[in-house]
Each structure stands twice: as C-alpha cells, then as structure tokens.
Swiss-Prot record:
Paired cysteines (S-S): 117-167
Protein's UniProt keywords contain Secreted: yes
Organism, scientific name: Halichoerus grypus
Protein's recorded name: Leptin
Molecular function, one GO term: peptide hormone receptor binding
GO cellular component terms, semicolon-separated: extracellular space
Listed Pfam families: Leptin (PF02024)
Superkingdom of the organism of origin: Eukaryota
Record InterPro entries: 4_helix_cytokine-like_core, Leptin
C-alpha cells in the first residue's frame, strides 16, 4: 500500500517540470477582457419601455453604490452581491451577465491565489435583505439601477486592475 502511494507520488513528481503555470499577465488580460464583455452586454440591454435609464427609486439601498474598490477580495464581494441580485431578478436579459459575473469572480480568485492572497470569501445572502419585496414592487427599476451601478463598478475595477490591486 505504501509502495503504491510512493510510486504514484514519484511519478507525479517527475511530471512537475513539464507543467507550466498560467502566466499572471494572461489571467489579468482575460479578466479585463471579460469585464469589457460584460460592459458591452449591459450596453446592449435597453431599459424597458417607459423606464428612465437613471431612475431615482427609494428602497434600492441593497444595490452597492459606486465606490472605488482597491482589493481583489473587495471586488469579489461586490461582484457576489451583484450576481445574487441579477440571479434574483429572473430576467432572461441578465442571465448571461450573471453567468459572466461567476466567471469573473473565478478569474479574480485565480489572480488572488497567484499573488498568494487568501481566497476571497463572499459574505452570505444577508447583504440583500428584503430583496423579494422590492422585486415584487419594481422589477424593471431594480434591473435598470442594478445594471447601471454594475457597469460603473466594472469600469472602476478595470481601472484598478491596471494599478495592480492588493489582496
């Protein structure tokens, strides 16, 4: 039993020189490209008929306001919140954006691990209290505000990635 484990370990050890790690710059470039793709998808979604693109709606405090986030874990936390909001909207137009946010979060975790940062952990669903009530009252307004703020947050993240964010 021990000999078999040792043989497998030595065989894997001999393969290590041939395994190439993904360059961090390539991961960062993929992250920037995905952010630009998500921004393009948001731009392609036109607001529903009769809804202002910059509405002033009360009760949408759970949607993060635009603020500069300088850490990878902070970016992951904001994206987790937006992903949860978009998933709750159950709108066909935002399904792909929600999936893209999941992929973007995975790329940010890969960047964090390449920098030897602790793996970012998003907080639980308590960040979006009362979302169901707001969705029943104003689904379209919530979607417009969420996409508008997400777009601004992604543009800020794009700038921060150029500055090499910390953990």
């Amino acid at each position: 039993m021990r000999c078999g484990s040792l043989c497998r370990f030595l065989w894997l050890w001999s393969c290590l020189p041939y395994i190439e790690a993904m360059p961090i710059q390539r991961v960062q470039d993929d992250t920037k490209t995905l952010i630009k793709t998500i921004i393009t998808r948001i731009n392609d979604i036109s607001p529903p008929q009769g809804v202002c693109s910059r509405p002033r709606v009360a009760g949408l405090d759970f949607i993060p306001r635009v603020q500069s986030v300088r850490t990878l874990s902070g970016m992951d936390q904001i994206l987790a919140t937006y992903q949860q909001i978009l998933t709750s909207l159950q709108s066909r137009s935002v399904v792909q954006i929600a999936n893209d946010l999941a992929n973007l979060r995975a790329l940010l975790r890969l960047l964090a691990s390449a920098k030897s940062c602790p793996v970012p952990r998003a907080r639980g669903s308590d960040t979006i209290k009362g979302l169901g009530n707001v969705l029943r009252a104003s689904v379209h307004s919530t979607e417009v505000v969420a996409l508008s703020r997400l777009k601004a947050a992604l543009q800020d993240m794009l700038r921060q990635l150029d500055r090499n964010p910390g953990c």
